């Protein structure tokens, strides 16, 4: 069996980057893929990012990946910009996973020959010390992950990389094979994620709220300097994400009530199977 290989680099934290490799082998039983993961935890300054990318490229010399993925916030920031530069100069096809600020460098990434998946609802949290402790950070990310999972955003990411893996198994990946995606509320209008239209609009509402969380967090973290104002502002951003998660959960519950939840597991050979009825076998 032909095996596709990929290296995932995680610098800083996005909901999508936390899950991007695991979405592709959810039961750890695929025989057609092999991955390596390196990262810097939550750090994304240029020095840390450069060290992580260098580590990935060192691993690549022996591992010989078919492609490399870099995931983290704000692809336009200095650290991620360094990663883009290093990956563009490497011999490996590369994809950047980012959030809404990455739109500022979308054209630049295309000029660099990079693929990209920009997830606009993958929003920054309210990182003020007076508000954000480890527990609050974890709760926010749990809500964010529910939004991205239950609305189908993660499935879009899964499908994009599964297509790339199939290309790698068939032949060498070209620049034209790399995904170039911007995911937002309207992405759901182009897909058949939900059978119940009310489930779809609840999911769309969840994504719209989540996308706007980023603007509120930026205001509270970087614009407003009065503590009496910025603490409530960042806290309100987290309340928005909590409500978005509730809407996303309601959307999935509607699909459950109709026995229509879409599931797309991987077979051991990597084939993406599909089913909706709870007790039927995926095909």
UniProtKB/Swiss-Prot annotation:
UniProt enzyme class: oxidoreductase
Protein name: F420-dependent methylenetetrahydromethanopterin dehydrogenase
Entry annotated with the keyword Oxidoreductase: yes
SUPFAM superfamilies for this protein: F420-dependent methylenetetrahydromethanopterin dehydrogenase (MTD)
Family: Belongs to the MTD family.
Free-text activity regulation comment from the record: Strictly dependent on the presence of salts for activity.
Known partners and oligomeric status: Homohexamer composed of a trimer of dimers.
Enzyme Commission number(s) of this protein: 1.5.98.1
Pathway the protein takes part in: One-carbon metabolism; methanogenesis from CO(2); 5,10-methylene-5,6,7,8-tetrahydromethanopterin from 5,10-methenyl-5,6,7,8-tetrahydromethanopterin (coenzyme F420 route): step 1/1
GO molecular function, one term: ferredoxin hydrogenase activity
Temperature and activity: Optimum temperature is 75 degrees Celsius.
Species assigned in the record: Methanopyrus kandleri (strain AV19 / DSM 6324 / JCM 9639 / NBRC 100938)
UniProt region (Disordered), positions on chain: 255-283
Pfam families: MTD
Keyword field contains rRNA-binding: no
């Amino acid at each position: 069996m032909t095996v596709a290989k990929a290296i995932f680099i995680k610098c800083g934290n996005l909901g999508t980057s936390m899950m991007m490799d695991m979405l592709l082998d959810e039961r750890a039983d695929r025989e057609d893929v092999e991955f390596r993961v390196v990262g810097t935890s939550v750090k994304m300054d240029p020095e840390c990012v450069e060290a992580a990318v260098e580590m990935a490229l060192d691993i690549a010399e022996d591992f010989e990946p078919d492609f490399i993925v870099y995931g983290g916030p704000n692809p336009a920031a200095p650290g991620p910009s360094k990663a883009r530069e290093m990956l563009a100069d490497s011999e490996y096809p590369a994809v950047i996973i980012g959030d809404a600020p990455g739109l500022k460098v979308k054209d630049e990434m295309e000029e660099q020959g990079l693929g990209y998946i920009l997830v606009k609802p993958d929003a920054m949290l309210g990182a003020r010390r007076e508000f954000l402790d480890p527990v609050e950070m974890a709760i926010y990310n749990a809500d964010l992950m529910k939004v991205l999972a239950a609305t189908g955003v993660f499935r879009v990411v899964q499908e994009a990389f599964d297509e790339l893996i199939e290309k790698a198994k068939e032949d060498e990946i070209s620049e034209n094979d790399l995904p170039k995606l911007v995911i937002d509320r309207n992405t759901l209008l182009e897909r058949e994620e939900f059978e119940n239209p009310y489930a779809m609009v609840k999911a769309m509402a969840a994504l719209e709220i989540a996308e706007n969380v980023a603007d509120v967090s930026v205001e509270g973290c970087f614009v407003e300097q009065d503590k009496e104002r910025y603490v409530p502002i960042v806290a309100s951003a987290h309340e928005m994400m909590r409500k978005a998660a509730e809407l996303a959960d309601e959307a999935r519950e509607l699909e459950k009530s109709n026995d229509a939840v879409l599931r797309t597991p991987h077979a051991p050979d990597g084939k993406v199977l599909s089913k909706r009825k709870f007790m039927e076998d995926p095909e």
